[in-house]
Amino acid sequence: MSAPDPEYAVVIPTLGRACLNRVLAALAEGDGPWPARVILVDDRPPHDPRPLPVEVPGELAALIEIVPGCGRGPAAARNTGWRRAPEPWIAFLDDDVVPGPHWRRALAADLAAAGGGTGGVQARISVPLPPGRRPTDWERSTAGLATASWITADLVYRRSALLDAGGFDERFPRAFREDADLALRVLAAGWEMTVGERRTAHPVRPAGPWASVRAQAGNADDVLMARLHGRDWRRRARAPRGRFPAHAAVTAAGAAALVALGTGRRRAALMSGALWLAGTAEFAAARIRPGPRTGTELWRMVLTSAVIPPVAVGHWALGLARHRGVGPHPVFKSDISGNSPGHG
């Protein structure tokens, strides 16, 4: 006798982008057990009166539930979604991914292979890059998702593990680090995190010339991670350190040059300015070297390489101020009452 199909719900936070239709179309294709429900959390601002722009395939029409997310970010939106779903497994998908062929069947196999102590199973993520040329800086940044750990682009959690950990921490306001934070708490609660066999593609989203500058807001979230999980959180979350130490040094050199110039110390200003210029040039060269080296990309790298270090340091400083004295993640007793984690 074959084992019964696993019961699961799908939760997708969305801003109503057109790519949501692509996710739903991929979910409807192939074979395998259907989810009990597909919860779309509408995370647009609450004052937006328009209905969520979505085209639901006929096969999913009876399963779709659209709930308001109030525009408080993906962590809060995912909490809104999974708390509405009683199923034992919650599959989180981003609204800009493309689940692979036969995704439902592959998910069922991943869940069937999960042991009683498995709290979460991550998909294998791929990032398609344009053929025939080197990827841009933004494309390479997105490609890093293929090797990232515990990203909720496609990650299924056991509901009892979510209850045990208290869900996503809504103090993470953007799609950055909120997934690693939850995974560390699930692991700390004694659950295992594994990688399954199902596959999902994460296409590169179109982005403006300043996307890499806006991404520096994540440095404030890194401060929150250190406050919550200790200074070695990167090792446990398998998150590379990145260039922040170099950004801090370059920013310090630039600030020193400006101060020296303002106080009439020309020699000190020249020395500090030379250090700033050398650091900025090295950063730009490191970003240009693996890229397509078109005129547009070259100018974009030169300009943003000068701007990124001080912006990164600024967000880090804001994070220090905002998260000073921060406490552990709050566990919602109303979610946990009457439920047990289901492992030893």
Report the location of each language-model feature.
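Short, acidic, metal-binding catalytic loop of nucleotide-sugar glycosyltransferases
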Residues: 25-35
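A short, conserved alpha-helix in the catalytic core of glycosyltransferases
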Residues: 154-157, 161-166, 172-199
